[in-house]
Amino acid sequence: MSLLTEVETYVLSIIPSGPLKAEIAQRLEDVFAGKNTDLEALMEWLKTRPILSPLTKGILGFVFTLTVPSERGLQRRRFVQNALNGNGDPNNMDRAVKLYKKLKREITFHGAKEVALSYSTGALASCMGLIYNRMGTVTTEGAFGLVCATCEQIADSQHRSHRQMATTTNPLIRHENRMVLASTTAKAMEQMAGSSEQAAEAMEVANQARQMVQAMRTIGTHPNSSAGLRDNLLENLQAYQKRMGVQMQRFK
């Protein structure tokens, strides 16, 4: 799974189902594909979204700022700074500084995520705040590792509060991952289609998958329900691949 797919999965797992979730998913896809390069407009849009908690807005603002190229002197946004101040708790700030020093030594996404997971959500948010306020720099991979660790902790607490049966991997994250991968596969099918005879069919299947993912994000579904979506899409994709005589990577 690519780094950006993983980041998208984790970030979306903490956003409540509804039309806004589908909209945010689209914005993230556009940002990661380099299609949305107006950071100022993006942040203004994010600031005025309803429903989202200040921390979720802070995390999204941090991700957008990391990903969208911007002029050096671009002003930092107050709503992101306030969300990433660790509730003003000096203990969170102390821990954030310790974590930041460790993250400086971690250059990989997984290494950074592993280190960050042993800290509290408040300390993780404060550490993001340090980086956001340009008080320190880490690699982009390290910063994304920090983001995903924070989202995993939030999703874990949401999952516990949902009183769902615990499994080895958080079902909310797994569910979101299936939907992100279904979208990615749909995109790949469209690219593969080209001008072949089956192009219309491939586009149709991809379009159906995309609409299904959007509908699931909008109305909200049980974490197990996306397994069926994944299986249907895989079936369609494999049948299409057979005819095209190509192989694509499976996803779970």
Curated annotation (Swiss-Prot):
Q: Which cysteines are joined by disulfide bonds?
A: none
Gene Ontology CC entries for this record: host cell nucleus; membrane; virion membrane
Tell me the Gene Ontology biological-process terms attached to this UniProt entry: viral budding from plasma membrane
Please give the SUPFAM superfamilies that the UniProt record associates with this protein: Influenza virus matrix protein M1 (SSF48145)
The highest taxon in the source lineage is Viruses
Complexes and interactors: Homodimer and homomultimer. Interacts with NEP. Binds ribonucleocapsid by both interacting with genomic RNA and NP protein. May interact with HA and NA. Cannot bind NP without genomic RNA.
In its UniProt entry, what is this protein called? Matrix protein 1
Q: Which gene encodes it?
A: M
